[in-house]
Amino acid sequence: MTTRQLPLFGARRTQRACFFDLRGGKDSAKFSAYTPKAVKFFSEKYSLAVVTKPEDLAAFDVVFFSLHCFRDFYRVARMAHHKRPGQQWIAGGNACTTPTAVAWIMDYIWIGDCRASFPLLIAGERDLQGLYDPRNERLIRYVDEDIDPEPLTASEMEVSKGCPRRCLFCIHPWRHHYQEAPQEKVEAFIRAQPGKGVGLMSNSSDDISYYDDIADVLTATGKTDMTVSNAVQGLTEQIVSQRKRELFLGVEGMSERLRWVVNKPIPRAVYRDKLDLCLSHGKQIRTVYQFNLPGEEMHDFDELEDDVRCFQKKYSKGSWAIPFIPNQPSAHTPFQWVVPRYSVEMSERLMEFRKSLFGSNKTGVAFYSPAALGPAKWFAQVISEWIAITPTVADAVERLPQKQDVQTMVDALDCMGVALPRAFLHRDKDTVFPWSNIITTGDDADKWKRFAGMQKKLASERFQSGAPVVEDREELRKRAGGTAAA
C-alpha cells in the first residue's frame, strides 16, 4: 500500500478583511469634511468590503477602522462588544496620534500616513514602524509620507500637506513637513474632471506656490474649487472676484492681540480691509474663530463685535457666517501644555450675539452664527486624548453636567469612578503625556520653545495693553500683494 507524507504546514488560510464605517454609511456627501474619505479610498483600491452594521463583523478576521475625530472614540466604545475572539481590530486615521482612547480594544493602531503601508497591513505585516501595538510600549515615529498626487476620490486630490505658518494651536505644521503636489498633476486632474466642482485639498490655498495658475485653469475650464480655504492676508481682488462659492477664512483669535499671541498675527486693519473687499463684492464669507484661547477676556470679543456691527451698517448684500469653536489644546502641538478651560460666561455671550443676528438678512448682509459646542461635549473630546474611552467611561461622560467649568466636570467624573491623570490640570516642561511615546516633528520639532515664547507674549506689556502688532504688518503686506493697510 502506497503511503503519503502529510505536509507539516498547511496552506495559510486567507484572512477576510473589511472596513467598518462608524457612521453607518450616513455621511457620503461630495466634498464634505465628514465623509470617510480614507474608507472610500482604501476599500475601493484594495477591494475591501465596507460594513455598516456591527452585527455583520463576525464574518471577518481583520477589521479596519478610520478614526476621523475624537467622537469616533465614543462610537468605538458603543460597538466594542461586537468584537469576536480571535478577530483583529486595526485603527488608523487623524485621531490616532493619541491612541490611548482605543488602545484597550484595538490590536494595532497606525500612526500617521498610510498610503504606502496599507497593502502591507492587508498582507498581514505587523512589524512596521508606524504600527503601534498597545502590548508593546516602544517609541513610534509618526509616518509623514511624501505627498501622493493620486486622487483621493473621483473629484478630490491632496494638493498640499503641512503648513508653513506654524500657528501654535494647529496640528498641521507640527506633524507634517510642508509639501505641494506637482503643479502639472493638479492641472491635469482639473482638466480631466467632467463635473463643475473639484476638491483641491490643502490647509490653506494661499500657501500653494502655484495657486494663482490653478485659479486661472479653474476659470478657463469653468470649474470651482469646492474645498478652498484662504488666509485672510492672502486675499486679493483677483481671488475674491473669481470666487463663485463661499470664502472660508480661519481668523481664529477674536482680537488682534489674541491672534498675535497664538502666532497668527493678523492686524485688525488688515482683517477689516479684507472683509471690506469680500463684502464689497457681495460674497459669501465664513470666518472661523476660537474662544477659550490663552489670555482671552471679554474685551477681546468686544473688538470682534464692533467689527461685525460696522459692516452690518455699511453693506446691504452678501452673507457672513461666524462660527465659534472652543479651543481644544491638541497633542503634538505647542498647545499641549495649555491647561484646558471652558468659559461658560463667554459661551453665554456668544449665544446672545447669535440671537442678535436673527433676521439680519431682512435689512442687509445675512449674518449667521451657529451654536457653539457646549462644555460637556467639548470636555468629552478633550479627555479622550488622556484616558481609555471604554463603555463605562462613555456612560459616565453622558451623565456630566451640561454647563459647568472644567474643574467641576473633572470632579463629577471622579465621583463616578473615572479619574483623570494629575497632569491633565498640572502641566510643565517635564510632563509625560499619554501620547509621549508617539514622536512627531513636522517642520519644527521644538514645541516647548514655541510654548515658552507664547508665555512671554502673554506676560508682555504689549499683550496687556492690547497695542497693535506693528512689526508684523510689513510681512503681511508682502503676503497680501501690497494691499494691506499700513
Please tell me what each predicted stretch does.
Residues 25-33, 148-184:
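Canonical Radical SAM [4Fe-4S] cluster-binding loop centered on the CxxxCxxC motif
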Residues 52-138, 334-381, 396-401, 447:
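Glycine-rich beta-alpha loop elements in corrinoid/cobalamin-binding modules
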Residues 18-49, 73-79:
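Short, charged N-terminal beta->alpha structural module
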Residues 1-17, 27, 31, 125-159, ...:
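N-terminal [4Fe-4S]-dependent radical SAM core
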Residues 1-22, 44-50, 359-486:
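Radical SAM enzyme core and accessory elements
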Residues 19, 26, 62, 190-303, ...:
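Conserved SAM/AdoMet-binding glycine-rich loop
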Residues 26, 99-102, 165, 260-262, ...:
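Flexible glycine/acidic-rich beta-alpha junction loops that bind and position SAM and/or redox cofactors
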Residues 43-59, 187:
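A short, well-structured beta->alpha microelement
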